[in-house]
Amino acid sequence: MPKMFLLFSHKLTDDQINDARKNLKVDEFIYLPKELQELWSNIPPDVDDIDNYLKPIKEFLEKHAKPNDYVLIQGDFGATYKMVNFAIDKNLIPIYSTTKRIAKDIYKDGKIITIRKFKHCRFRKYNPY
């Protein structure tokens, strides 16, 4: 059964875990080690080329992931683009989580407070262009 490697800055929700187990047949979820998670969550905005910055994350995937494992990739647009292409090149399956946004306005003391909730809908593959 495939594993799911997690390149994003949150914890999986119960809905995401259940969906991955049921529909993708994932049996194990692999979070990045703490130091790599810090890298992924803090992509520097002032660096022209992030290839060297992402190298430790790529090395982690090369060491631990096998073809047809899933990689949930969400975050900085440039880093996501590079890691999606890396995953495809390594015969991994890059995916992202789709959500339904529910917004509710609350009127209190002459002010409008907007509460947004995000509900997981499904995982979707990044397909090569």
UniProtKB/Swiss-Prot annotation:
InterPro entries per the UniProt record, alphabetical: MJ1673-like_dom
Superkingdom assignment: Archaea
Name of the molecule in the record: Uncharacterized protein MJ1673
